[in-house]
Amino acid sequence: MRILLLIISIILAQSKYPADSVLTSPNATIIEKAAVLPIAGWQRLSHNTRLLDCQFYPSCSQYGAIAIKEKGILKGIPMTADRIVRCNPSAFFNHLHMRGGFHDADGRLIDHPTSHLIASKKKSPIVAGILSIFPGAGRVYAGRWFDGFMGFVMVYFTASSAIDASKRDNYFGKSFAYSMAAIFYTGEIYGAYRSAKYYQPQ
């Protein structure tokens, strides 16, 4: 019952947090709103805690909301998983290496879902995507070894959770864990492709 009340309060709340704009948008489909709902819930926590400040602009949660709204669920969710993997201790170094921009107001790393970066021909995005059959390998090929390590860890943990949930025969837990594993796995393929295509040293 508490979860239902939380969901209703998030849906009916005023647009105080960035993802709320998608929830209240008349142009967003019910499926997009359902996908953005957990992001809106997360923003109610992360935007009120300095420890959870994101190093990127827009933040990972807002990036996810924008990606789902602009690209649809099938592309937006893997894009969000890719961004979560890239939000790691190597992000600042990687951003400098490719001469990325910084947000004037607070110095965060600018990284929008719709990239305005020029495609690089140094690495093959197709090869990076194919190598991602083994999670993390495509990012390593693209020169992002720490992102590759983080991607492998995310896929490993979500897949392990799915296998454990299967052993316990917990339908909800199993469905959720397999969904998360699939999201991060597809995010790895997308992320490796994008890393090889855009995120190369300038």
What is the predicted role of each segment?
Residues 21-202:
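Hydrophobic alpha-helical membrane segments
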Residues 12-21:
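Cleaved targeting-peptide boundary
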Residues 2-12:
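Sec-dependent N-terminal signal peptides
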